Amino acid sequence: MNGSFLAGAPRCADTGAQNAHLRRFPRPSSVDVRTKYASLLGTSGALHLGIFDPPGTGPVTGPCGLEAMIEIDGSMHSGSGTVLRYAVALAALRAEPLHIRNIRARRAKPGLRPQHLQAVRACAAFCGGRLQGDEAGSREIVFHPGRTRRGGAFRFDIGTAGSATMLAFTLIPLALFAETPCRFTLTGGVFQDFAPGAFHMRDVLLAHLEPMGARVRLRVERPGYVPKGGGKLLLEVEPLRSTLVPLRRLEPGKPRRFRGIALASRLAEEKVAERMAARCRELLAGDVPVEMDVQQDESALQRGAALYLGAETSTGCILGADQAGKRGRRSEAIAEFVVSSLQEDLAAGATVDRHLADQIILFAALAGGETRYRIPAMTDHVESNLRLVEAILGARTAREGTVIAVEGIGLKP
């Protein structure tokens, strides 16, 4: 493959631009056919992995016959709950035990929060695994994944306004490798700060997974906001029929259409949704069409609002930005933030937005071949996820400037 990791020095195969050499992240060195060791340094310490075998070969044993276990420092790079979610999902796919410590060590309230607790418990329930240390506030857990992936119907309630969309993100890769279709009913927060909303997940992430061969549907049954939560998502995942197809997105193109959703719950009199939509149209006025879907909702447990805006480009790229409402946050300010965020990513020449930049890494690492795309900027989340898929799955990753490359392991369903 031209420009692949497997043929000499890798290059960015971007037409219209000079090929650039990619910097490889360090890879675990082989000890023998079945066993590898690795030590990958993070910004606040090391990500240490115990003995583990190449993907697909099953569990191995370490010295004295002890079961091998993946050891991860949860404070690496972003030190966020994303490290935990990624690690648990990847360990479940490998069916290998995981010990993760220093969970969310950099956060004001470190340790497991309800949404993280539900994510690891959901993974365990789905694959028939066992957990140790799974309690609120815990800074370390041990996860022994099972090998069952039967599919079926599942219900998970976070019990707070914690992100149900991030729970969905944790479950999607596991469900893709289930024996039968999966149907998840997820209750919690659907639109809040510090987590992409459900519209972004549906219209951006799932839109990119479809050409990779993943059939995933997401529907908002009821919006949920901070602090009451109570939102409901319906997530349906079909098992993969073949290995995921790698994604190539190197030409950003020009915006050819903007499409947005302005949602307001129990705020019809204040015309919050209409004001967000109107401000978006004002800021985007020009030759590019702007389509805004104004939605009024009365089913949420509280007042709330959310705005999503997506851009479709001439080369088929889809980028998005969103923000939830908050007390004291004006409708017009929400629109200005969302439009500005999207325009910044487009101006950077990115082919994916700042959220998809790290979200797509896990799926690229599972695909059979090399995925390449341009990100708006390097972030701790991107760095963390690249290192995790290298270390746990054995995927190869590289970057040059804002070009990310991931050589997937080709995990078969």
Residue locations for each model-derived region?
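Flexible, glycine/charged-enriched surface loops at secondary-structure junctions
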Residues: 130-134, 181-182, 213-223, 284-301, ...
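C-terminal functional modules
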Residues: 373-413
